[in-house]
């Protein structure tokens, strides 16, 4: 095979398994700039309501209207005066401070302060702990 002259091919190179660019690749900034330089037509379209879930938030206006129309008083029950006095009296008989009582029932001293000032929302679990620690009936009929 002693050839004469340079070796040349008479066919075009074929690339196997090269995929066409997908939509994401066409939106790439580099691709768009290349298309602008070559003078190709570029269409830019903004999606309507993209990224803002308007469909989900539009239903809240009905609920807001219902809440505005509702006149009922929405508040939690607080500790009744009799219970406040009973806790203070039982604690006084046992000669315990608020922090000592709180330590006995594994609660924070602030919880006892809230119960004795009437700001707490009654919790049956805490009330039963108080009854056991103080040895007095705080709930129900005496």
Swiss-Prot record:
Q: Which cysteine pairs are joined by S-S bonds? A: none
Q: Where in the cell is it found?
A: Nucleus, Nucleolus
The processes (GO biological process) annotated in the record are:
positive regulation of DNA-templated transcription
**DNA-binding region residue numbers:** 98-117
A Pfam family reported for this protein in Swiss-Prot or TrEMBL: MBF1
Q: Which Gene3D superfamilies match?
A: lambda repressor-like DNA-binding domains
Report the residue ranges that make up the HTH cro/C1-type domain in this protein: 87-141
InterPro entries xref list: Cro/C1-type_HTH (IPR001387), Lambda_DNA-bd_dom_sf (IPR010982), MBF1_N (IPR013729)
Name the UniProt record assigns to this protein = Multiprotein-bridging factor 1b
Tell me what organism the protein belongs to. Answer: Arabidopsis thaliana
Lineage runs: Eukaryota, Viridiplantae, Streptophyta, Embryophyta, Tracheophyta
């Amino acid at each position: 095979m002693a050839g004469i002259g340079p070796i040349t091919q008479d066919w075009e190179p074929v690339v196997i398994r090269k995929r066409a660019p997908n939509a994401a690749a066409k939106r790439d900034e580099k691709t768009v700039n290349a298309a602008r330089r070559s003078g190709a037509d570029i269409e830019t379209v903004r999606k309507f309501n993209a990224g803002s879930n308007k469909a989900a938030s539009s239903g809240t206006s009905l609920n807001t209207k219902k809440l505005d129309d509702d006149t009922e008083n929405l508040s939690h029950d607080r500790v009744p005066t009799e219970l406040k006095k009973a806790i203070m009296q039982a604690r006084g008989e046992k000669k315990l401070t608020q922090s000592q009582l709180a330590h006995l029932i594994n609660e924070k001293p602030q919880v006892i302060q809230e119960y004795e000032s009437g700001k707490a929302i009654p919790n049956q679990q805490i009330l039963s702990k108080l009854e056991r620690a103080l040895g007095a009936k705080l709930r129900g009929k005496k």
